Amino acid sequence: MYGAKVVTTRVSRILEGWPGVVLVALDGLDRPGLVYPEVVGAVRAGDLVAVNTTAADLGLGTGGYHLVAARLGELESGGEPAPPPGHLIKWRYTPSQVACLTVEETEHPGARAVREFGGLEGIPVVAAELHSQVPAVAAGLRAAWAGPGAPDSGGPGRDSATRERRLIYIMTDAGALAARFSRLIGAMKEAALIDAVITVGQAFGGDVEAVTLHSGLAAARAYLGADAAIVAMGPGEAGTGTRLGFSGLSQGEALNAAWSLGGRPVAAARISWADPRGRHRGVSHHTLTMMEVSALAPSTLVLPELPAPLAAEVLAALAGLPERHRVAVADGRPALDWLAHKGIRPSTMGRGIEDDRPFFLAAGAAGAYAAGLCAAGLTSAT
């Protein structure tokens, strides 16, 4: 069974927004409407629009916005629209399908590098389940690359050791499909936590588009010169409360892809004692299930340094971890210091670092561990 609720209304006024997104007030609706101008076109007060209210009406979805699906009525004349930039379609066979110039197409400046890609050459690839983990993973890498005391000696991002390292975020299509929906991406780029974003599969809106996760990883290394990569979905995981019915299983698929292409797969653990749901307390059942049934490639699951009772609880939960995997422990605290210095405040289910510190420590620890792999003689592709 399927169902979508679409209503027609008018834009009453333009509200705030962020790059690639415009928020609008809508007549008769109590939530803002979210507009992707790259998909819908520009909107103005008074425009008649079709609005998809399905997720917001159900109380679902990160952000709580209605989505403006189309501008209706007579459009302004302005000659023929510009031709699409490429030939690959994302959001395929939906009314919102868009054409992209992907890195695999011959017209793309990265096409040759991807065609000649010979492997990831041992770079670490950190796979995270949730979008909210990405800033701490990135900060863990940057803090470790910069060395001890970097936030107090000129500030993160100014140290040559971290400026020379390239970190690429690969956003999959397991969550939000539009990279523009994420405010964290813009904040991470502005703070020099990440150098570029590649959107793969049906996801779109990154600095580079790729058809598959594998070609996205190839582009990260061969075209963008990644010293490390982070793979995670965009905002908004799909979950059902069942063992296999959650889109975070894609984390294991990312570990498999990294291993198959010659990278070093590193898994960020999902750990929390603030989540009210029992299945996510301690080590989340998502992490346990993913490492068992989805991550078939030998991978390293990284844990943060924790007080002894909590560490013992985590290790007990991991007693049944398949033998193909290994567990490592790293310090996630420098990552959180780095985020604080840069003014980046990620949250998970409304909980910030001060509310759910182990969750973010675990993500930072994965980044710190991955940076150690870079230190073991890895060099940039560029």
Q: How should these model regions be labeled?
A:
Residues 36, 46-51, 55-56, 60, ...:
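Long, contiguous hydrophobic alpha-helical segments, chiefly transmembrane helices and signal peptides
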Residues 2-122, 145-146, 161-168:
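Extended, charged alpha/beta regions that create polyanion-binding interfaces
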Residues 99-149, 159-210:
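Phosphate-binding glycine-rich loops and their immediate beta-loop-alpha structural context
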Residues 58, 176, 274:
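Flexible, glycine-rich phosphate/dinucleotide-binding loops
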Residues 55, 173-174, 271:
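Residue-level signal for short, function-critical loop segments
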Residues 2-27, 144-145, 164, 168-169, ...:
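Non-transmembrane, aqueous-exposed alpha-helical and coiled segments at domain scale
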Residues 33-40, 125, 172-176, 351-354:
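A short N-terminal beta->alpha junction/helix N-cap motif
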Residues 154-157:
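N-terminal amphipathic/hydrophobic targeting modules at extreme N-termini
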